[in-house]
A protein has these predicted regions:
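Hydrophobic N-terminal alpha-helices or hydrophobic patches in metabolic proteins across all domains
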Residues: 1-307
Length: 307
């Protein structure tokens, strides 16, 4: 039995003649826009209702992703995405009832979500940027593996996972390179990794491997500090984003090396890739983000007051 909200989205997409993924992206965009209205135009009478709709839409968008994480057996993200909808609804109701008494931390969080979603949406929706992030991630990881003497690897030609069609080489894709005019499959643009002799490694690089999600959390948190001068915010961004990228390259290299060298390893039914990618690397990333936040609190004490 299909989940009711996913079924409703499917019915809407069928009536519009577009893919489910496109409707979900429209929900995300609408949520970001209405939250942005609530953040940047919060003195207007309609701002609380706009924010309430935005929280609900963003919660619904994340909730609709939970089915995918159930399929790939990622319990951490299942819990986080499934809980987003009730939390979003609760925040929307609270916004309407307590708009004039809303603490500055909630106002900041509203802007944080907006300015985290906007850059991710742009990167995802502009194929050239999307492919650029994927290529940079794969190339940097390959270079680190080679430099550290952990093996001889090479990048295979970039592939495109088309929604409902399958995977084809990028050279055969005739889609628009500047505007995403068609939905992509689960992997989107991706680069398989190979050994130097051409044998395939069971790891590919997709947009999610670029740590873009981690970067946009800090982008949103820093940009939303509207009371802080831009020069201080830019300095914090220049420190946070390159650091996240470098740490992510080490993370990816570790996952590749462990997966490639411990093929038969299992722990409670999990293979090496599933264990490192879904558990070890996630908890390691959360710890690294925690340390990053502590460092940023020294640069931006205002950020600490909102968290």
């Amino acid at each position: 039995m299909q989940e009711p909200l996913a079924l409703l989205v499917g019915m809407i997409s069928d009536s519009l003649g577009i893919a489910d993924a496109s409707v979900q992206l429209m929900i995300c965009a609408l949520g970001a826009i209405t939250l942005g209205v609530g953040f940047h135009l919060r003195s207007e009478w309609y701002a609380p209702y706009s924010s309430a709709f935005g929280w609900t839409a963003m919660g619904l968008f994340l909730y609709l992703q939970s089915a995918h994480y159930v399929e790939i057996s990622d319990p951490v993200l299942v819990v986080m995405t499934a809980g987003a909808l009730p939390i979003g609804i609760a925040m929307g109701v609270w916004e309407i009832r307590n708009w004039n008494e809303a603490p500055e931390a909630l106002v900041w969080f509203r802007g944080c979500v907006v300015w985290a979603v906007v850059p991710y949406y742009l990167v995802y929706s502009i194929p050239m940027l999307n492919m650029g992030f994927v290529y940079a991630t794969a190339w940097n990881t390959e270079m680190l593996l080679e430099f550290a003497g952990l093996g001889s690897y090479q990048m295979a030609p970039m592939m495109v996972d088309l929604y409902g069609t399958g995977e084809i080489p990028l050279s055969e894709w005739d889609g628009n390179r500047w505007i995403m005019s068609e939905p992509l499959g689960e992997n989107g643009f991706f680069i398989p990794l190979e050994h130097a002799d051409g044998t395939v490694v069971s790891v590919s690089f997709i947009l999610a491997c670029s740590a873009l999600q981690s970067m946009i959390v800090f982008v949103g948190a820093i940009v939303a500090l509207s009371s802080v001068p831009w020069n201080r915010r830019m300095r914090a961004l220049f420190i946070a984003l390159p650091t996240i990228h470098v740490l992510n390259v080490f993370r990816n290299a570790g996952i590749v090396w462990l997966t490639d060298n411990y093929v038969g390893w299992t722990f409670m039914g999990l293979g090496m890739f599933d264990f490192t990618h879904s558990y070890a690397a996630k908890f390691g990333s959360l710890f690294a983000m925690f340390l990053m936040a502590l460092a940023l609190f020294d640069l931006l004490p205002e950020l600490h007051r909102h968290i």
